[in-house]
Amino acid sequence: MSITNPVFSSRLKTLATLGAALFVSAGVAAQTVVDQTAAAQTAEAQAWRTQLTPYVWMTGLQGHIQPVSGAPTVQVDKSFSEVLENLDAAFFVSGTARKDRWVLHGDFSHASTSSAEPLPMGLSARAKVRQSSLTLTGGRNWQLTPQSSVDLLGGVRVWDIHAQVQVPGVASAQSNTSFVDPVVAVRWRYDFDKQWSSLLYADAGGFGVGSDVTWQALASINYQWRENIYLSLGYRHLSVDYRSGGKRLDFSQTGPLLGVTFKY
């Protein structure tokens, strides 16, 4: 014999209805969270992410300078401490912008130095070099592993070089030279953990278009100091060999660097 209690049955139906409603609501809420997370990730991937790095480059200077045909060729070989003694001005900054897998990178270097160099027959020449270079590249990023990625880049390096050689009481010659070199580059990053990472960068160019050859190499260790601030310690080499119409500008800069990166 079964006993049906109308009140009990009504309560069961009410509980079942509420349970179903809660289940559906939870499912909708979960799907909403997933949709919002996916939308946020998509928006982040589509937005430009930028960083700016002013840095100090403790570079030496080595090379040969002949500002015009027939002028004396001066050999320069200065350590950073010697360059610092004769440094007139210097400014270095680099920046990167990323959107999804696309990458834009730029670096600007400017330095002006002057020094006295010996010549044959007991003469002395005063050499002054003001060099500015702007490297602009773009390309694509590939994620190799969860900890490492590589950028393959192509672009140009724009040079503006003022060179002057003066032999007191004998002669003086100067030239202003500007040219553009095509460059190809590779940039590899490896994350050791959430705070420490390493960076390797190399490029090569010129190919006879502007200079005969230009190349650059850089290695750095980076530390995340604040949420959007990174500190870097590295070593950099940059060289160019330009020869045209009796003019020779063949020099390289090498030395350690310290940088601060601000991410936006």
Question: Where do the language-model regions lie?
Answer:
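Residues that define the transmembrane beta-barrel architecture of outer-membrane proteins
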Residues: 46-48, 87-91, 130-134, 148, ...
